[in-house]
Amino acid sequence: MEEGLLVRKIREGTVIDHIPAGRALNVLKILGLTGREGLTIAVVMNVPSRKLGVKDIVKVEKRFLEPSEVDKIALIAPSATINIIRDFQVASKRRVEPPAVVTGILRCPNPNCVTNSEREPVTPRFVRVSLSPLKLKCAYCEETLSEAEIVDQLVSPYG
């Protein structure tokens, strides 16, 4: 089989590579991309990968990521790489890493946690306890969040 480009190169923008298969649409949700922004967006799913077996790729022309967006992507795609493209060339490339401490992005699933009290507004805070599989622990009640729970919260409209 002849190998070639599935999607053309982009002039300026961001390529998010090495996304676990099936999570590209979650990445789009996290970035708030619906396809109505006027940006050229390419989503390639289930591409063969030596590193992951299969992977997803997201290319977004004329869009660069904020650090908070990179942190969220790292929580659902810890193996991802972010490539910044300028004039059709990779200007920078870096692997994401889930943050050691996550504040204000996720909510604690423990209804008795102080962060869920209406009387006492406390910002939820989680500490990373494991990278593979990704697990976070509430800094207040020590309830843990699995990778699946993290993904659900980040892509849920109620998250």
Swiss-Prot record:
Reported cofactor(s): Zn(2+)
Gene for this chain: pyrI
One GO CC term on file: aspartate carbamoyltransferase complex
Cofactor comment text: Binds 1 zinc ion per subunit.
NCBIfam families, A to Z: ATCase_reg
Its biological purpose: Involved in allosteric regulation of aspartate carbamoyltransferase.
Biological source species: Thermofilum pendens (strain DSM 2475 / Hrk 5)
Keyword line: Metal-binding, Pyrimidine biosynthesis, Zinc
Name of this protein: Aspartate carbamoyltransferase regulatory chain
